[in-house]
């Protein structure tokens, strides 16, 4: 399995993206958390099209956790991961507040994964096959773990799986990038008609600086994106670019 080619990564939250400060398996409260930056760093090296957090939170239905207290914590984890990875990878999440094991969205049932992949396709127009997805979690049925629900979720959904410890111990290559035009998302070619892709971040940065200085017109702006990035469809009711560029100058 080559995880550098996985376009969508589903990932558990408790014990995977975050740990308890108290050291207990389950948090004593919404405050009992710390980010697992070693996992964040590995995800950034992969730069998939999306990282989608899927989390069982049956304690909400049981009355152990108030949803008004949990939701800001969930949003905080999503925002931290989005900020760390960068804007070219979508970060989103869904949690199941129900404790009923038969509920279609409670892991190991694949409802959350099915929903989020469908929503990703709806919002971007990009179809991702299940074999191009990966699930990462800490409930792998290994010795000392409380269950195998994350592993079974991947099996029920139909994608590959990695335990979070195995994931963090992997030697991953540095991510590669391609240079695109902002106007249409197409890969830029050099003077010899070779696409500017499979570049390190420093190489991609140098290319963008050179192209921008050589083509100062606004319609010739460039940027670099991860190799797995694809052009999403245009959102509904998107404003159309004006033929004439209007510059706003402050009053003196």
Model-derived features: positions:
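Active-site neighborhood of HAD-like aspartate-dependent phosphohydrolases
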Residues: 1-52
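Short, electropositive alpha-helical surface patch
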Residues: 61-84, 106-119
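Substrate-recognition element of Asp-dependent hydrolases with the DxDx(T/V) motif
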Residues: 39-74, 89-102, 136-139
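Short, mixed-charge low-complexity intrinsically disordered segments
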Residues: 194, 201-251
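Conserved Lys-Pro-Asp/Glu-containing loop-to-beta segment of HAD-superfamily phosphomonoesterases
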Residues: 105-148
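Acidic, Mg2+-coordinating phosphoryl-transfer loop and its flanking beta/alpha structural elements
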Residues: 134-173
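Alpha-helix N-cap and loop-to-helix initiation/capping positions
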Residues: 27-35, 65-73, 107-108, 145-149
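Short aromatic-glycine-(Arg/Gly/Cys) micro-motifs in beta-strand/loop hairpins
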Residues: 173-196, 211-213, 222-226
